[in-house]
Amino acid sequence: MEKKLTHEDYHDVARMMYFKYGNSMILGGHLNSQEVNHVIQVGASVLMTKDGFQQGGSFVQAVVNNDLLGAVNRADSTMRKCLLFMTYLMAHVSVSYELEEAKNFQFENIEG
């Protein structure tokens, strides 16, 4: 029987994906810690919306619906830098597949 996913599971996977791949997909380089937290929260929302776990806001809906114009028009300044990462999450990440790695991912070497 497959484990029922939780909000925490989605956040764990979004966080791991950001620290594995996010920096290479962010326009304009480095984000501050508040922006990183925002990216992880919105990334988790993209994954939850994609899976039907919960419905995200208008930016997230546009990303999930592959609506580039809508996503750009609804993106805040941080999300404009992160559109590539958000579309990567939408197209290539399965929470149930990535969850075990996310639970065991070593963040201390990355976060400094």
Briefly describe each language-model feature range.
Residues 7, 59-63, 77-84:
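Generic hydrophobic segment detector
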Residues 20-74:
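Amphipathic alpha-helical interaction modules
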